[in-house]
Amino acid sequence: MKKLLVKNIGLLATPEGKSAHRGEEQGKIKFLKNAWVLIEDGIIASVGTGAVPAVEGAEVVDAEGHLVTPGLVDAHTHLIFGGWRQNELGLKLHGASYLDIQNAGGGIQSTTNATRQASEQELAAKASKALDEMMGFGTTTVEAKSGYGLATEHELKALEVIKDLNDHHRMDLVATFMGAHLVPAEYKSNREEYVRLVCEEMMPKVKEQGIAKFCDVFCEADTFTVEESRQVLEAGLKYGLRPKIHADEIEAIGGSQLAGEIGAISAEHLIVCPPEGIASMAKGGVIACLLPATSFNLGAVFAPARDMVKAGVPVAMATDFNPGSCPCLNMQFVINLGCLEYKLTPEEVLTAVTLNGAAAIDLADKVGSVEEGKLGDLVIWDAPDLDYICYRVGSNLAKTVIKRGEIV
């Protein structure tokens, strides 16, 4: 049995439980001073304070009085893609909007072209490098979407890459099928046929492949309507894929209301989410997966996070790592923005990037808190307390990252 003992933890900060926290519960964090954590064969065996137990054969890590939290959970990424889109920066600086760039042949379609041309090996190598960087910032679990293939062969290829990464990289990954990311150029004059392709051809093969756990759709002006999104998500449910939905990122066309109606596990973005959307999500038990770094990169407003907390909607936060609207893979920056722009407390933010993020990908029983029986995923921070990592913008404060009981 492999054992790792983390001792001399100045302050251990963790949410507790195996489900998402909402309302006042979102800000409830357990703090333990002078703590220790014992991990056996990758699983947390015990957590305590005071005298450190003598554990025969254990590797000992001295936290040197620093802060320790659960490993961070990045519950929304577009990890698998070819190329980059730095050429769009100048267009943005001259006033082009996200939809302007997309409608001119850039945006998602540009990345789709590059992704289709890339081999599985090329996509895996690129994504593996990104995962290394993510882990260096304290992320230990990642959701990864397909969605830059937009053809059956290439969507399945992206999901195979995610499986390969999950099998061979230290990071734990969960796959989401997102064939409904955009109507590709070859179907612009026949979008109904593309929706049919996603629902009737891609979905059965995704189920047969057995990699994806979720189905996502981009419900937005100039992408997929509410009814098209409903059609996609209902087809996903038919094939055993739990629904997620990109909603209210640019225009509020009803995506957040659909999330509540269909019982989505999470709704993403929600930058311009209206009160009726918040109410629908609260009623439907939907987790709001907010992406503040995307607002930052787009120069957009920030999602009404406080209104969601007040309404009893569980709030998670993630990077939205992608080559266009958010080439950011640093969850520490997400933490900073959660406090500075959403005005969430450090405690609410910690829950958002750990337990609620885990719940948004149906892993709250395995990760997201430092508790007996969960995976031994920890971050030792170069910080004395939780406030410090929220207020120190622009520095990597992850001193030591531990994944399944092993030092990364």
How does the language model describe each region?
Residues 1-54, 386:
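N-terminal metal-binding scaffold of metallo-dependent hydrolase/deaminase domains
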Residues 5, 58-62, 401:
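Conserved beta-strand scaffold positions in the cores of enzyme catalytic domains, especially
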Residues 9, 37, 42, 65, ...:
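Divalent metal-coordination and catalytic microenvironments
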Residues 63-126:
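Metal-associated gating/positioning segment near the N- to mid-region
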Residues 111-126, 132, 140-253:
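Metal-coordinating catalytic core of metallo-dependent amide/deamination hydrolases
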Residues 135, 199, 207-208, 237, ...:
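Non-catalytic positions within long, well-ordered alpha-helices that form the structural scaffold/packing
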Residues 242, 252-369, 381-387, 393, ...:
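Active-site-adjacent C-terminal substructures of enzyme catalytic domains
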Residues 397-408:
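Short peripheral tails and domain-boundary helices/loops at the edges of structured domains
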